[in-house]
């Protein structure tokens, strides 16, 4: 049984405070987690004011994940997803070959959790093994790479993708460059945390060797359109470095201007959903609205924002809007607020959103958005005004695409994604 001390370190706390302990047992080929609150944390009004995970209640004793689950969402949110796990697996493969790790060594969920570099970990939860030493992981350097290293980082990510057998002589150097700044981040696509000249962290999302269109360029276009619509979206920039496709960089919204941490929870965690839950099993935007109604610090404002994002997603055919691609930020002492919008990408030939708009319909249909507007506390008059304004803005997508440097062929291929913006 691995004992992991869990600390809270969001911006309003004077110092990191221990929330409790995560017990990671091994069952066959996976970990089974149990969590218990620190008694002092339960008595601390700065820590016990809100639920961090629907599966973890504010009481003493060990608590367990939901049925058919092995981990809690709150900890999954600060663990690596497919890209980060790939980097860690590649490093272990090389360590075994070089005699630095015993043959047969396997990575468990707890290894992925503790293998994320503490400096770049998403959110404001931090971890210590056996409640000793530094917060983990603390290997592989301290500083995020500066923007000037983006070309080299992108080249390393492309080289890594082009070496599926992990045999290249330069592979360990590529991993050294990528694993600290990139192992903490979610999603399957290659990426890394980088720092601007003021030390602010950004996520650089690199082109993949498997791309057949400019994914980063189009994500930038959608980000610009969302900003012009008045949606809350993190600052983004796009530039070409080591390929003809754009690297899209977005400023991290889980850090303050002074480097403090903001606690982030995915919609998957806050709705008690699991990976893969989508419209086909009833996952809906109405569930996100319920989170804001029950736990929101500014529910009226955020419900309106959330409904507006539904309209926008329909207009740009952002059909990768699954539960991990929506999130909340902790507003200490008050509850939760909707995070900045992120991971919005147009899809040229799309059938429906990943989440239902009504209880049972996910169609790319503005009538569905109109139907549920009242649930999001948006009046019929306001709904029509928002839809009309958004259509006008999104209707300028080709102009933004040209300014971004996307070719006519790219524009022709992506045009179907924006067809609902035409009045």
Regions found by a protein language model. Name each.
Residues 1-323, 327-423:
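Phosphate/dinucleotide-binding and metal-coordinating scaffold of catalytic cores
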